[in-house]
Amino acid sequence: MSPKQVTCRYFLHGVCREGSRCLFSHDLATSKPSTVCRFFLRGQCAYGTRCRYDHVKPCNGTVFIPPQEMSPVLSPPPLFPAQEAAVPPTIPAPQRREKKTLVLRDRDLCGASVDPALQPGCITESQGSEGEAKPHSYLEAICTGLDESQDPASYPGAPQQLCPFAQAGECHCGDSCPYLHGDACEICGLQVLHPHDQEQRRDHEKLCMENFELDMERAFAVQASEGRVCSICMERVYEKQSPAQRRFRILSDCNHTYCLTCIRQWRCARQFDNPVIKSCPECRVISEFVIPSAYWVEDQSKKDELIEAFKQGMGKKLCKYFDQGRGTCPFGGKCLYLHSYPDGTRAQPEKPRKQLGSEGSVRFLNSLRLWDFIEDREQRGVPNAEVGKLGELFMHLSGADEELPAPFN
């Protein structure tokens, strides 16, 4: 038998790669097996033009259904004469409109070359008795609804969220991004301005301007602090090795420059009197406050703001002398630290009472108790010579040196 008389089995399945060069026959007339897509005959082929079977209608117009898919039809059993008399006559049902089966098909997967009027289940405008529209597939209905939906900007109360990636600097979605891309801010350069919300634009521009002014002030402060030299160690403060030492100590009543380490050593010295320690090492002007700062401050108004911020910061720390009511603070109401009890109640400020000692020392007396005097007397040492003199004086005053009278015989 010649190969041309044998039908190509790959061609029957629509996957023959040889085409006209194939040695076997590509004639469907001589092939007994049918290559017509049975799903196409029912209008349910999801592959469309990519289907390997033929999408053609039979010439006689009959639809071939495979035997395995035919449902068995059960014929009613024959009726006996007695049963035929008992069966009531059939009443014709009112004419109802025949329901037409609608098949949902993907528009992208359906065969584009096939005439829609030839596909079963499809209803054209001419077929409908009342001008019914062509039914859409599920995917087509969704896409059509999305395309015809109204723009969210037309709704006055619709929420419009700005794209977080565009706000950070770059959005890879571009024009296809589902979020709203804002206008670029002239100060920060980011797309953070809402195109429709004027209040949001004003708030952001105000906040951005405040941050810009703070950055400018910080830049000017750094520029003014770069060339400052400590008056004690004669080193540039910003050129010290440790970053923790690159800080200034601002004196409240003096404009001389000192670093953090040098002025701390000066204020902690014990070989000098208190007025000397509190005064400036160079001009001898007494300063009550020494404030640490990362930038050099020379203007008096800036110093006042710095002192106020320093007081507020110290007022949040507990005083180690007061010790939540268990101790006594020698500074009283002038202490910068927090005086509070364990329950959080603030202590009432009281003025410290001062007492000048015999040696010229000053003592702070906040509370006077008898036991304090007893402890002071016991702890105070008395020389032995003074003890002997006190004993002789006591004996003289008591009359112990007088001769006792002679006893009666």
From Swiss-Prot:
It comes from Xenopus laevis (African clawed frog). The lineage of its organism: Eukaryota, Metazoa, Chordata, Craniata, Vertebrata. One of its GO terms (cellular component) is nucleus. It holds the Pfam family zf-RING_UBOX. In adult males, highly expressed in testis, small intestine, large intestine, stomach, heart, liver, kidney, lung and muscle. Consistent with its role as a neurogenic inhibitor, expression is much lower in the brain, and also in skin. PANTHER family: E3 UBIQUITIN-PROTEIN LIGASE MAKORIN-2, MAKORIN-RELATED. It is found in: Cytoplasm; Nucleus. This is E3 ubiquitin-protein ligase makorin-2. A zinc finger (RING-type) spans 230-284. Residues 185-214 are annotated as: Makorin-type Cys-His.
